[in-house]
């Protein structure tokens, strides 16, 4: 992008972990400044009322883009388990209740799937990235928002294994592993990023970022 003032891209998260992960996965061009709502002093959060990851990603991208006037990238992601008809889905973070923790969510998931054989424990991580572009109109009017999706297939283990990653990683066996094999909680960050739902969504968003000047 050459010399000159930084191009600013707002990421719709207050999580430094997610911000750092996206910075690494997106391979942005030199001169792109990645910001969070906290960096800009933007208060509040949108109400995520959607029943799909795409809807909620769009809600977050629109909310922060309109308040900042900056191009905004939003992520909505979670776990879909076949035996739970796609649950916990958009309720992934609060699966075990409003005060849910990773531990309580994993404990509930193990209880829900207790006794099921490996072939009935299929699951996938899903990530949807939405890029809102202030000043550009969408096909139906309003803010232009571009969406890309990535998935990572696997199965739910019968016990927690590994202390790496976060969320359901200690229970998630990637499809490349046999039943009872390693979970994402046992993988290095580099190995996980090579196959993760977020890395696949980021790869599909890369041409969009290139077109809009955020990627070299």
Regions found by a protein language model. Give the residues of each.
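Anionic-ligand binding patches
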Residues: 2-10, 16-216
